[in-house]
């Protein structure tokens, strides 16, 4: 009884909610065997014929290629594409592709040479001798993708399944009206399909392998049963005809009774599904070593005279295939790629056949019927009853039309399989699937933009963190460089420190000052006082300071000379006589200096106290006052003003007179007041100059060039400084 119950459960099938039963038009094309189509003169191969990114080009314009040669490299989800025939690459440029809007995608354009030569093929007849990874890599590099319509890379799908897969399902339902590509392939190539299924089972190692096929394909069912007569590892399940039984989620529920969760995949419940056409392509890639370069395409519709299924090379223009089938277009002829429910109308016929192209439908006007006008929704809920995904198409329609993306997402619009059952039953002729496709495209665009923004933010934050780390490292490096000198500078620094220590050792012992106490400067103070006492003793023993004597002031002498000249002029004016030759101020200054020297000598002999030194500034002021008074008296007398007395010249002459007086004193045996070595030379030079000028004036000759009073004053000052310096040096030597 238990075995009978297990056998009953083994063949049990389930059902799904919703679904429709449209009229079938499969008999138009499934009655004739597969046939080859003549090669087109030109092929357009889009680089992206699958879900994922396009591969990297490995050919260039002008290259000659062979059939099966890779045109791109595949990494990750990038699936390579291959040349459908031998020929020459004439262009690599964007070209319109199989898309409702005929979007242009980068394509390789090849001119066929008609030879159709293959690359060197290497098949793995004993595929069991190769590892699972090697088989998956071969399937991927040979460009095998899901041929049922999704176009997902088969190698990536097998790799992602891993050890989670317990059930492998082969989809042979082909529920779409008009399409018979899989039906005809199973009738003509059943053995190759089963071999491909066994390769997939060898890779995945599932517990069971199920083939699901609708009961409207009796010839295909009989062919598969004949091939599987002795097989116990593959089970054939015949299911009732119902649209859309061929959907992945619907067929999974029919064969296993399990439902794929919202937003999930069939692999989440241990199920992996492949199409019969994909199984056939896997067999050719692994066993025969042939990349996918062609597929079965159904050519049907009342607008073609020879409907059927053909082997169409990838990249063949749609126009070329339809012309081979006897295409007779009408005035407003449409061509649908895919079935009447899930397909889309082509904008023009120059688009190429790609891996997901399974049908080209060219219906007549009577076959499709007149286009119906879209009306308002009457809320009849017929769409909800027909939806196989348990969605609410009415609500999704309002959300899509009102651009309410959040609500549409919350109502699981992503689970819509776009089967078209809702639009088929809608009494208002609302193209619901078009609204849903547009809404999903907008949601995907928003998510893509959000993803890009998040990636940009992550890059910015990573950059900021990197800059902060670099700044911290840079500051630490600068800090360590400032604190710790480089290794190569250690020797130089050590040598400098050694020299400093050596100098400190040779120098006198430094004064050490204790913290909180005053320095002991008693020794320095005592030495300074001793030097001062010694200097005072020397000054008392040798009174030198000639300039300190009252009569030694040149300015006072100049004042006296000016006063003498003024008195002389006044006496002359009172006598009424003509003024004689003006009194020479230099001579008067010399006489005054001689008089002062004599008076000084008498004072020294008498032992009197020295007179207080005359302030030179005060003497200069008095001299200036005397000169001003003399000029005023001259002006009052009406006489010509005498020559202005130059105080600097008078000072020089006074210095000369003092020098003569000292010389006379020294000759008379008196004690010299100060050494005359340098001063004597300066005085003699000044005397010589004065005598020369005096002789010139007495001879009545032309007056010589006037002596610059500033130069004379400077010379006299230099002479005095030199004399004082010599006197001080002599005192030091005597000590």
Curated annotation (Swiss-Prot):
Which EC number(s) does UniProt give?
7.-.-.-
Provide the disulphide bond pattern. Answer: none
GO BP term, example: electron transport chain
SUPFAM superfamilies according to UniProt: alpha-helical ferredoxin, Nqo1 FMN-binding domain-like
Compositionally biased region (Low complexity): 666-689
Any idea where this protein resides?
Answer: Cell inner membrane
Give the Gene3D superfamilies listed for this entry.
Answer: 3.30.70.20, NADH-ubiquinone oxidoreductase 51kDa subunit (3.40.50.11540)
Residues annotated to bind [4Fe-4S] cluster 2? 387, 416, 419, 422
For this UniProt entry, the molecular function terms from Gene Ontology, in alphabetical order, are: 4 iron, 4 sulfur cluster binding; electron transfer activity; metal ion binding
- GO cellular component terms listed in the entry, alphabetical order: plasma membrane
Q: Which cofactor does it need?
A: [4Fe-4S] cluster
What keywords would UniProt list here? 4Fe-4S, Cell inner membrane, Cell membrane, Electron transport, Iron, Iron-sulfur, Membrane, Metal-binding, Repeat, Translocase, Transport
Q: What does this protein do?
A: Part of a membrane-bound complex that couples electron transfer with translocation of ions across the membrane. Required to maintain the reduced state of SoxR.
Instruction: Spell out the family assignment given in the record's similarity comment.
Output: Belongs to the 4Fe4S bacterial-type ferredoxin family. RnfC subfamily.
Describe the protein's quaternary organization and the partners it interacts with: The complex is composed of six subunits: RsxA, RsxB, RsxC, RsxD, RsxE and RsxG.
| The name this protein goes by in its record | Ion-translocating oxidoreductase complex subunit C
- Which organism's genome codes for this protein? Salmonella paratyphi B (strain ATCC BAA-1250 / SPB7)
